[in-house]
């Protein structure tokens, strides 16, 4: 395989846009390595890590489960009611996650695509670690319908979440490539195949 298969691609998109489908296609059809920041966030909170110690020091023993682990649901309820507490948590977790992302990128298999998915790709500067960022855009009404069907969200809840994320227009500006996910899965897959081919044929 070609050396330039080691490209790093960031995938951005709002809730209900179909990012998970994009990641699945890249994994199945292009043997890509998927790095999800949310999973890394869990890892840096495990007992015995620096993240665990810092979070326990910042938020106290009350956020620990009976097993001595961080109760992520309890911690989430606590910080999302208080913007200052949320900023405090992010100040601990984000640098640790970014450090782990950098480590995994530096150690990646040079014969495989490396895909980075994080909700705060641009806000944390992780887009600068990528060769390209691909935005997944979907009409808002389609996203709302998907969220109702798959997660049981009300329209109000879906719209509230969407308002706090990058709009389709913003993604079209921020991203080097845009994948439109308004149609059938095969249409999305075809776009991904073309995007991968173009990226690998145009090394930087």
Where are these regions (language model features)?
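Hydrophobic anchor at the beta1->P-loop junction of P-loop NTPases
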Residues: 11
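ATP-binding Walker
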Residues: 17
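Walker A/P-loop
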Residues: 20
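Short beta-strand-centered segment that lines the nucleotide-binding/catalytic pocket of NTP-utilizing
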Residues: 32-45
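ATP-dependent small-molecule kinase phosphotransfer cores
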Residues: 42-113
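Small-molecule kinase domains that catalyze NTP-dependent phosphoryl transfer to phosphate-bearing small molecules
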Residues: 97, 101, 128-129, 149, ...
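ATP-dependent NMP and nucleoside kinases share a basic, alpha-helical "lid"
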Residues: 99-108, 113-150
